[in-house]
Amino acid sequence: MDLTKDILMIHSWVTQPYAKFWGLQNETKTTVKSTYQRIIQSCDVYIGYSKKGPILLLEVYNPANEAVGKHYPVRADDAGMHLLMAPPKQRKSGYTWQIFKFVMDFLFSSTKINRIVVEPDSQNYKIHALNQRAGFLVEKQIRLPEKSALLCFCTRNDYYQNISATRCNAI
């Protein structure tokens, strides 16, 4: 990600009504830029592209360095993830799930990652459904500074078993 080049796009995404759980909905471009200047100090931030242009914003972080790490024993092979889809140009059934799987495959392509940790807002039911479909298990509800969240984990094995079962059920 190139913050100087991408800030207008990021601002337009995080201020969308569907992005309310990012907590930046009413923020200015200046505030969003300073937020991301801070985020990129401790996270890897990616903009994912398809042939048609940018499709996702992905933050990958070390849970030991974040508030979530105070709520469970962090392992060396853990990676935290925040994912935001680009505003849809048109609705396409299954599209978000395909992108979600792409991100999971991307993360698990690293031999350093064996478990993905997420802490979605307790009220974010759409992401709960995607997480469950991918094999995430809810450990517990936690209180983070900015939200009430579900602490969820998905191991590499759980993910690939779930994906395999999903494929078999579709046949």
Show where each model-derived region lies.
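Conserved GNAT acetyl-CoA-binding A-motif
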Residues: 109-120
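Conserved beta-strand in the GNAT
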Residues: 47, 53-66
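Conserved acetyl-CoA-binding loop-helix of GNAT-fold acetyltransferases
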Residues: 92-106, 129, 133
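Active-site rim helix/loop that mediates acceptor-substrate recognition in acyltransferases
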Residues: 24-45
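Conserved acyl-donor/pantetheine-binding loop and adjacent beta-alpha core of acyl/acetyltransferases
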Residues: 60-83, 87-91, 95
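A short beta-loop-alpha structural element at the N-terminal edge
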Residues: 1-9
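C-terminal "cap" of GNAT-fold acetyltransferases
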Residues: 77, 144-171
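Conserved active-site alpha-helix within GNAT-family acetyltransferase domains
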Residues: 122-140
